[in-house]
Curated annotation (Swiss-Prot):
UniProt source species: Saccharomyces cerevisiae (strain ATCC 204508 / S288c) (Baker's yeast)
An individual GO BP term: proteolysis
Similarity comment: Belongs to the peptidase C19 family.
Catalytic activity: Thiol-dependent hydrolysis of ester, thioester, amide, peptide and isopeptide bonds formed by the C-terminal Gly of ubiquitin (a 76-residue protein attached to proteins as an intracellular targeting signal)
Name listed for the protein in its UniProt record: Ubiquitin carboxyl-terminal hydrolase 1
Modified sites of kind Phosphoserine: 530-531, 555, 618, 638, 653-654, 670, 755
Length: 809
């Protein structure tokens, strides 16, 4: 960074003063003009000041960035201002707390902001940071505070040791370097052993600030404190801002930092020694029990190592697996022979999210999330693989057949020593074949080189224990064979507000160890695709997302792809198009009569009538023209319009005849038709990428306080769920465990029921409050009428009296 600043200063001095010789040569001339000299000296002083004080320059750059950010937020021409119908928050939203906060785009930081906003919607993550990280750290600090006496004694011993290693109060030469290395390594070791939750605290504080209730205010915060707490933060350029990175990469960095903090709280390494079932803790997490909790999960050891039951079949052991964060789960992978069914044991491993690849064929087509999950978990066939059991079985059959042949021959013709050796080998193979799994060591000892059997194996992976917060990454990078470049696959992925993971999950007691059978013993759950098949949002949201996509089109990349595609299409059309084909070589160009048309039919050199060919071509041409006109009309509406702000387009398009009215936002808490099960997860947030592979913008949709928010850096506003589910360019999805074990319902549904009941109570109170003033008003009006009648009677009696008060009559 210092070299970069120095180069900029030298360039500036070169521009202002020329070379140093020119500056000295013209110094006397400049001194005659005091004004110019003062200006140059002032500029030179400012440059030197910023060179000596780079922090002040950073502060000014950040201040200017903040000023431009404020202008961008407050300016009506902002690119991502909310639409006019969203500027007014419903009273129901205000009752729930109003606006949530945004995040400042500090130069290409939309990928960070979208990930942080998505994580802020997770209840499981917030509870984990409060209870499992910060509270544990406070307990450790309290225990260390109670043991301060021992710490002071150890510090005195260390000081005495340092004093004894010095010579005359100083250390020289190689001995000094050796001590420095020892002290630095010791300090690093102590730092690594000390609990450090700096990042976790910064993350919790930032997420809490985002989730606070701001009502009608629209605040936004910076991510500087969080990035400073990261050991590997994204690279930043002082002028250009942060390097554009992938949201998935930043998400992985967040997980790495969080895991590092959790490990610092417990420096003891996880003991993977199997534990007997009788010695398991009372609250042990076995299989899929208590999916919302994070901790040590126990898996049956006999599934991992089937030969473990040979020691003692009466004792069932469990192997521990440590889940560090709420985003950690466990997958089960089975690789087995399709001929004998043997597998080397189920491979359980901890994962922190799923990455689903889009198919390379039919780029741009519409896909389903359930389809991508099924492709991820479908069995993979591996051909030409050695199988230990099949090879030893073949060797056993061969040797056993030899023994049968030996028995048929006369006694003494075969050496007894050879017969005994074959019998011993057969017996050894039979003992090994009796094991559940044949180890590689036994296979190497007993197999015969010419008895190797190649077979086919199946490889399949399922989710054994889903994490409390499941992250799904849609990998949209695809290799384009036409341009030999990596480009973005813009296929639309349909997803639901709730996801039943049952078809892709398998508990520990539901796994088939025989590879010839389906991996899961349970019947394949019916995938509920009803909501995915619907065109959610309709035409309005389709055009809306097209406008957002057009905002971040990379013209150069699209042009290269279009040129390559156009060349391919033109070559294809050139070889297939017969519209200019003339079998008569222009001999009948001037013929137009009906008789001459018949002549064309009769003289076709290819055996086809010219008239028929012309009619078919004209029909096709007319159909193409008609289709092109229809496409042109669609393009005129959706694609050929100038790229202007979406909000301005929606406002100005109100005068057009074919304007599509925006659907109203449903602020009420909705209920899903997906059944409530422990494996039913609720959608919490969605990260969307607009643009191409090399250029674009990340935004986030996240559900909080019962409604969906669209967040583009500093800009935050409410949207309908239909807009979220109709998003075509989904990049990441976050589904959260939402099942309430006590009631057997989803927590979102319970909150919706409670909210609806509160609204009904408020309406009843309002109605009662309206009726009571009406009754009191009617009662008051009756009293006023009675007083008026009495007053009239009094006035009438007064009219019949004279001044003296006597009755005139």
């Amino acid at each position: 960074m210092d070299l970069f600043i120095e180069s900029k200063i030298n360039s500036l001095l070169q521009f202002l003063f020329g070379s140093r010789q020119d500056f000295l040569r013209n110094f006397k001339t400049w001194s005659n003009n005091n004004n110019n000299l003062s200006i140059y000296l002032l500029i030179f002083g400012i440059v030197v000041f910023f060179y000596k004080k780079p922090d002040h320059l950073n502060y000014i750059v950040e201040s200017v960035s903040e000023m431009t950010t404020n202008f961008r937020n407050n300016n009506s021409l902002s690119r991502w201002l909310p639409r006019s119908k969203f500027t007014h928050l419903d009273e129901e939203i205000l009752k729930r707390g109003g606006f949530i906060a945004g995040l400042v785009n500090d130069g290409n930081t939309c990928f960070m902001n979208s990930v942080l906003q998505s994580l802020a919607s997770s209840r499981e993550l917030m509870e984990f940071l409060d209870n499992n990280v910060i509270r544990t750290y406070e307990e450790i600090e309290q225990n260390e505070h109670n043991e301060e006496g021992n710490g002071q004694e150890s510090a005195q011993d260390e000081a005495t040791h340092k004093k004894n290693t010095r010579k005359g109060g100083k250390v020289y030469g190689k001995h000094k370097k050796k001590l420095n290395r020892k002290s630095s390594s010791k300090e690093d070791e102590e730092k690594s052993q000390e609990p450090d939750i700096t990042f976790s605290v910064a993350l919790r504080d930032l997420l809490s600030a985002l989730n606070a209730k701001y009502y009608r205010d629209k605040p936004y915060f910076k991510t500087n404190s969080l990035l400073k707490a990261m050991s590997k933060s994204p690279r930043k350029n002082i002028l250009l801002g942060y390097d554009q990175e992938d949201a998935q990469e930043f998400f992985q960095n967040i997980l790495a930092e969080l895991e590092s903090n959790v490990k610092s709280l417990n420096t003891e390494k996880l003991d993977t020694t199997p534990v007997a079932k009788s010695e398991l803790p009372d609250d042990a997490l076995v299989g899929q029990l208590n999916l919302g909790e994070v901790g040590t999960v126990y898996i049956p050891t006999e599934q991992i190592d089937p030969n473990s039951i040979l020691h003692d079949k009466s004792i069932q052991n469990f192997t521990p697996f440590k889940l560090m964060t709420p985003l950690d789960g466990i997958t089960a992978e089975r690789i087995g022979c399709l001929q004998c069914g043997e597998n080397g044991g189920i491979r359980y491993s901890v994962f922190s999210g799923l990455s689903l690849n889009l198919p390379n064929e039919n780029i741009g087509s519409t896909l389903k999330l359930s389809q991508l999950l099924s492709d991820w978990s479908k069995p993979e066939i591996i051909e030409g693989v050695e199988c230990n059991r099949c090879a030893l079985t073949a060797a056993h059959s061969h040797l056993f057949g030899q023994l049968k042949e030996f028995e048929k021959k006369p006694e003494g013709s075969i050496p007894e020593k050879l017969i005994n050796a074959v019998k011993d080998r057969v017996h050894q193979i039979e003992e090994v074949l009796a094991k559940p799994v044949i180890d590689d060591e036994d296979y190497k000892k007993l197999h015969t080189a010419n008895m190797v059997r190649k077979c086919s194996k199946s490889k399949q992976i399922l989710i054994s224990r889903p994490p409390p917060l499941l992250s799904i990454h849609i990998n949209r990078s695809v290799f384009d064979p036409r341009t030999y470049m990596i480009r973005k696959n813009n296929s639309k992925v349909l997803f639901k507000s709730r996801l039943n993971l049952a078809p892709w999950c398998c508990d520990i007691n539901e796994i088939n160890l025989d590879a010839r059978l389906p991996m899961s013993k349970k019947e394949k759950a019916a995938q509920q695709d009803s909501s995915e098949d619907e065109n959610i949002g309709g035409e309005y949201y389709t055009k809306l997302h097209e406008r957002f996509e057009q905002e971040f089109e990379d013209s150069e990349e699209e042009k290269e792809y279009d040129d390559a595609e156009g060349n391919y299409a033109s070559h294809y059309n050139h070889t297939k198009d017969i519209s200019n084909y003339d079998p008569l070589n222009g001999e009948v160009d001037g013929v137009t009569s009906d008789d001459e048309d018949e002549y064309i039919e009769e003289t076709d050199a290819l055996g086809n009538t010219i008239k028929k060919r012309i009619i078919e071509h004209s029909d096709v041409e007319n159909e193409n023209v008609k289709d092109n006109e229809e496409l042109q009309e669609i393009d005129n509406v959706s694609l050929d319009e100038p790229k202007i702000n979406v909000e301005d387009q929606l406002e100005t398009s109100s005068d057009e005849e074919d304007v599509i009215p925006a659907p109203p936002i449903n602020y009420a808490r909705s209920f899903s038709t997906v059944p409530a099960t422990p494996l039913t997860y609720s959608l919490r947030s969605v990260i969307v990428h607009y643009g191409t592979h090399n250029y674009g913008h990340y935004i986030a949709f996240r559900k909080y306080r019962g409604c969906w928010w669209r967040i583009s850096d500093e800009t935050v506003y409410v949207v309908d769920e239909a807009e979220v589910l109709s998003t075509p360019g989904v990049f990441m999805l976050f589904y959260e465990y939402d099942f309430d074990e006590e009631t057997g319902k989803m927590k979102d549904d319970l909150e919706a029921i409670q909210s609806n009941n509160e609204e009904d109570d408020e309406k009843e109170q309002e109605q009662k409050g309206v009726q009571e003033p009406k009754e009191s008003q009617e009662q008051g009006e009756g009293e006023e009428q009675e007083e008026g009648q009495e007053q009239m009677k009094f006035e009438r009696t007064e009219d019949h009296r004279d001044i003296s008060g006597k009755d005139v009559n």
